[in-house]
Amino acid sequence: WTRLHLNWLRKLELSKVQRETVEEYLATYEALTSKIAALDVRIEDIASEERYSEKVNKLKCIKGIKTHIALSFVCEIGDFNRFKSADKFSGFIGLVPGECSSGNTERMLGITKAGNRHLRRLVVEISNTYRRGAVGRKSVALRERQKDMPKDVVAYADKATNRCQRKYQRMMFKGKNSNQAVAAVARELCCFIWGMMTGNYSRTAQAEASVYRSELD
């Protein structure tokens, strides 16, 4: 609710009982809002600790990932290198397609949803943000999060954002429903999160630089 809407509620002409009820709801709303704000401050404090800050700041360079989501991934996973590949990590989250095999017949199913439910919910929440906005356009908030971050980190994050946005648009153009498109984007995003946390962004930048130099030679 906006402050304008809250003021409108307070100025409504109501009976005494209705006014008491509305005021009780508003008091509860204000109390919970204050509590959430205090928790957000505490989360920011924890995320700024040395053991978390580098990883959290890298993930925050990706569209849709703010502090509480980045910290959730860092704390839940710990060492991302325990997953040998992006596919293994996606499988842990529960975003790989299932398979039903019988004899010589193989049939691919929807995503398994067998994995970390909390992180899967978060990555789907992020993926829903890619339904909106033009490819390549950054919000003021995202630019601020990317400020002073290494260029290769920002470039990799932008690549992730653009790929995910294009994937959603492409699947919708092909006639897929929104849930299918978001699930596909979520899997793609998981791969980029794994890449960011395992240093793949650095290897990608080095490989691209090597190709560029060979073309000049």
Segment roles from a protein language model:
Residues 57-61, 67, 73-174, 213-217:
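Phosphate-backbone recognition surface of nucleic-acid-processing proteins
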Residues 1-58, 146-148:
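Glycine-rich, often acidic, oxyanion-interacting loops/wings at catalytic, nucleic-acid
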Residues 166-217:
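Basic, amphipathic alpha-helical segments enriched in Lys/Arg and hydrophobic/aromatic residues
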Residues 22-29, 49-53, 63, 109-113, ...:
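Conserved phosphate/pyrophosphate-binding and hydrolysis machinery centered on Walker-type P-loop NTPases
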Residues 1-10, 81, 105, 158, ...:
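HhH-family (HhH-GPD) DNA N-glycosylase catalytic core used in base-excision repair
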Residues 36-39, 78-82, 129-138, 190-205:
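Short helix-capping/linker segments at secondary-structure and domain boundaries
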Residues 1-3, 42-43, 102-105, 134-140, ...:
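Short coil/turn segments at secondary-structure boundaries
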